[in-house]
Amino acid sequence: MGQKVCAHGFRVGPTLIKGWDSVFYAEKQYKTLFIQDLKIRELVNKSFTQAQVSRILIERPSNKSIIININAKKPNIIIGKNGSEIDKLKKAIEKMTSLSEVYINIHEVRKFNIDAAIVAQTIASQLEKRVSFRKAMKTAIQASFKQGGQGIRVSCSGRLGGAEIARTEWYIEGRMPLHTLRADIDYSTAEAITTYGVIGVKVWIYKGEYTENKRYN
């Protein structure tokens, strides 16, 4: 089971080590709010591709307010000069949600080499620049261990190196206990749009076992 299911979704829950990316309570409005959250994430990811966004946590403490926490490798791109970009984003979200109270918090990801989303985006951007997929994967693996990663698994799927037949290449180093629920495993995917077609990138990073003071919210 642990080999097939999404490593992040497998560990989401109040007694497990991962938290939900959307936090709200709604009875009849659930579908509307869920679609709004998807549109907000799409807007942020499309507007700030260079910022390398890792996670977007959306909280709705009341019916009139929304709090958006954005984790990114380059937060300055999202903030913009004198806060111009974040003001544009805030106005766009206010228009989209019809809420008067929109709060946006930007957090910098310092250990970005053990953040699966950022690692996957980095590999994808290198593939788009025609860097060898083997070199991109090996560089990511080495950088991950330097920042404290205990295991990493990377896969690239598609017409690798311009080959006529699509295939999947894997690299794995260190431990990757996918069946262990207390194992803190980060997982993410990315897509590289190349002249040969789309190449899919998947990254799993094992950061160690969960302890009470290491709870990830």
UniProtKB/Swiss-Prot annotation:
Boundaries of every KH type-2 domain copy: 40-110
SUPFAM superfamilies per the UniProt record, alphabetical: Prokaryotic type KH domain (KH-domain type II), Ribosomal protein S3 C-terminal domain
Gene Ontology molecular function, alphabetical: mRNA binding; rRNA binding; structural constituent of ribosome
Alphabetized CDD domains for the sequence: KH-II_30S_S3
A biological process from GO: translation
Spans traversing the lipid bilayer: none
Keywords associated with the record: Ribonucleoprotein, Ribosomal protein, RNA-binding, rRNA-binding
Domain of life: Bacteria
Gene Ontology CC annotation, any one: cytosolic small ribosomal subunit
Keyword match Ribosomal protein: yes
Annotated Gene3D superfamilies: 3.30.300.20, Ribosomal protein S3, C-terminal domain
Pfam families, A to Z: KH_2, Ribosomal_S3_C
Listed PANTHER family: 30S/40S RIBOSOMAL PROTEIN S3, SMALL RIBOSOMAL SUBUNIT PROTEIN US3C
Entries under HAMAP family matching the protein: Ribosomal_uS3_B (MF_01309_B)
Functional note: Binds the lower part of the 30S subunit head. Binds mRNA in the 70S ribosome, positioning it for translation.
Family: Belongs to the universal ribosomal protein uS3 family.
Subunit structure: Part of the 30S ribosomal subunit. Forms a tight complex with proteins S10 and S14.
Record protein name field: Small ribosomal subunit protein uS3
Annotated source species: Rickettsia bellii (strain OSU 85-389)
